[in-house]
Structures are given as structure tokens and as C-alpha cells.
């Protein structure tokens, strides 16, 4: 019997404020509700979902370094535009990943248009709100479980 597939969900700075922080950009869902919905979806697919949210770059890096996950879904938040260190951590562990953003970063301030992750990601989802996380999760599960027999 093969081991259960595992996905690491990484959420960067200020995402702990979802539901009350700039709902025009980020929506009204809390991070807890997004994560719980993802865990329900993962459990239904017999996939384990591990989650970390931190405002501290080194904690995200440590979680990436220590994971035994088969796939990563990451919303680096503000670290998207600044963190070569998190990029290097993901590349260092050689785990495929999908980059997710709640808002459409390309329709916002110019400094948000650049990502240190997008060129290495399997895919990028932005601007679809909380649904983007579900789309990323379903894609990751499909990749891990392969085509149906």
C-alpha cells in the first residue's frame, strides 16, 4: 500500500487578518474557513493537508525545509515580491508548487506585479478569491493521484 499523499499549504504575512483586512481586495472569508474547506476537500480525496501561516519569513522557510509533503500550495502574500529566501527554500527541496493569490495582483499597484515564484511554479492562480485555493488544491490532488484508470 502506498503512503498517503501530503500537501503543504503555506500562507504568508497578514493572511491571518483575512475576513477583516481590505475585504474589497481579499474577500470576507477568514483564513480558518479557507483552510477548513481545503482540509475537507483533501480528506475526501484521501490526501493529508498540512498548514502553516506565519508573518515571519524564517518560520515559512523552516516549514518548507522540514516538510515531507509531495506538493506545496503557497500564497507568499507580501513575500511574493521580496523573498528570494523562500524561493530558494522551495527550489532547494524540489517539491512542485502552485502559487495562489486572492486578489488579481496584476490589477493592483505596480510593485505587486513581480513575483519571485511564478517562473518556477507549476501554475499560478490569482484574482479568484478563496476559490483559487480550491482550484489549486484540486489541481495538486489530480497531479498527485494521476489519471483515473
Swiss-Prot record:
Catalyzes a trans-dehydration via an enolate intermediate. This is 3-dehydroquinate dehydratase. Disulfide bonds: none annotated. HAMAP family: AroQ (MF_00169). Belongs to the type-II 3-dehydroquinase family. Its EC number is 4.2.1.10. It is an enzyme of class 4 (lyase). InterPro entries: DHquinase_II, DHquinase_II_CS, DHquinase_II_sf. It holds the Pfam family DHquinase_II. The active site is at 26 (proton acceptor), 101 (proton donor). PROSITE patterns: DEHYDROQUINASE_II. It comes from Shewanella woodyi (strain ATCC 51908 / MS32).
